[in-house]
Amino acid sequence: MKKWLCLLLAVVMLLSLAACGGGGSTGNGDSEDDEKYANRSKRFTLCYYEGGYGADWLRAVVTDYMDNINQDVYISLKNSTDNAVAREKITTQTGTYDMYFIEVDMFKKSAVLEELSGLLEMEVPGEAGVKVKDKIEPQWLSYYEEDGSYYQMPATNFMGWNWTYNKTLLDSKLGEGNWALPRTTEELFALGEKLFEKDVFLTAFAGKDTTGGADYLRYCYEVWFAQMTGMEGYNNYFNCLYNNNGTYELAKDYPHNIVEHRNAIEKTYAVAQTLCQGRNGMEFIHSKSESLTFLDAQFLLNQGSFRGAQEYPIAFYYNGASAQQEMTDYVKDGIIQQQDVRMMKMPVISSIIERTPSIKDDATLAAVVDYADGKGQLPEGVTQEDAAIVTEARNMMAELVCREFVVTKNAQNKEDILNFMAYLTSDRAQLIAAQHCNGLPVLNYGYVPTEEELGFAFTEFTQSVYDILDSALVVDIAKFDKPVHLAVGLSWYKDTSVSGGTLSGNLYIKNALTADEIYESTLQAYSATWKDRIEQFLVQQGQ
């Protein structure tokens, strides 16, 4: 395999010349009438959503497939700008394409999607004896299974969201070696105070997006909530289960799950409130946050300008693993200067010590975080049980598990589509895709490329992402495997005093409840209709 991969490098380098670039016909099927493939007897159209990782990786694997794997087929690529619109077209079977890469769930769409169980049994091209299902992790096979059938295949890797930070900026403002990454939320806020004194904001939120789609801080808050509940408690909460004398049961008549997790709700909300409103006269959130788009905030993290004017920078930003990819063109064009931006593990919510009786204070908690990271000894008196709680919390990472390949029921040349999908799971395709994503394993089929195989060294950012992925525990914000939470519209909190806006935005302008008020608001909001919603859900489930 290693020999074969080394030989492939030459092909990859050639492909990179053809596949890089933005939109039109580049010899990769990204137009309807690509002359290079015009005479091919078979064709199908793949409609894709160009997320943070861009589309160069997809163009590259499509080019490789058409040039080197199947020279009878032409794959035409079409860019979709809206996942919801694409899903609606698929659902109504109006103006659909043959295959989709879509970043939204496609559950309960068996009437309009091709069943893919046969694909899972196909052999992966170039890998004798290896089936497609062997390349997909069991947890994702379980996740996408619907009554014994499959209509979705996981697409891009779940590399999640976490805190990114600008080391260049931190070194220049605080002095290299004079600061440390925050291990707890108390340390995060203490660092924010130091930065504020240096004319640097700790972070920002994308307030211009009033729907909240780009305000990824909401994912951060939910991870802190999961840290307070633990993963088992988090799953129980959103599955609407509560502890009834030692047995976990569905809370049918009343939201007992909310009652059980009152402390987690209050303590998580308190951290969000402090982050957004500051403390001790210090501000942590950038003063222009209400006007920022997601891209604006990334510019501020990279010490760029805002609307043509130099602004105070931010040192941290809660972001996805595609952050480096999204800034690459701006660095190349000289719009922003190259910065040493990296990703870090989640600071542990300081209130977690209420779950860990042998950890008495934040300093001890920070030392246990070091132990969890493999950087020190377990402090004297701290139990292994409490250390395990902190380790689980430290490794949590937010993700939306909803990126799939699907085939429409009325697609043409379905056999050719399935052959292409089998190819996508190959190490060959995964290597080519990673080549066009700064070395990140963008395709979700288990292959992790080395620097030698890629032909270039990882950047500090890429290496930092890998360091997190090695032990990451996914907190799935989408929760499509928890249908009862969708039935009741369950969130970790509910502020009945506001209508619209995001938690970050409402807290920032102090148009939101306080941490002392949020539990009662949450309980009252859900208890009013809880019993009826659960009954409706059970009827829909045939129970």
Name each region found by the language model:
Residues 430, 444-543:
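Conserved C-terminal helix/tail region of periplasmic/extracytoplasmic solute-binding proteins
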Residues 6-7, 17-109, 124-132, 177-178, ...:
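Conserved N-terminal structural module of periplasmic/extracytoplasmic solute-binding proteins
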Residues 191-192, 233-296, 341-352, 357-382:
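Glycine-centered hinge/linker elements that transmit conformational signals in sensory
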Residues 1-4:
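Positively charged n-region of N-terminal signal peptides that target proteins for export
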Residues 74-76, 148, 308, 312, ...:
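Extracytoplasmic/periplasmic substrate-recognition and gating elements
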Residues 59, 81-118, 130-153, 163, ...:
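Pocket-flanking alpha-helical
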Residues 108-121, 138-180, 189-191, 206-252, ...:
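Periplasmic solute-binding protein
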Residues 102-161, 189, 344, 354-386, ...:
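Hinge/lid segment of periplasmic solute-binding proteins
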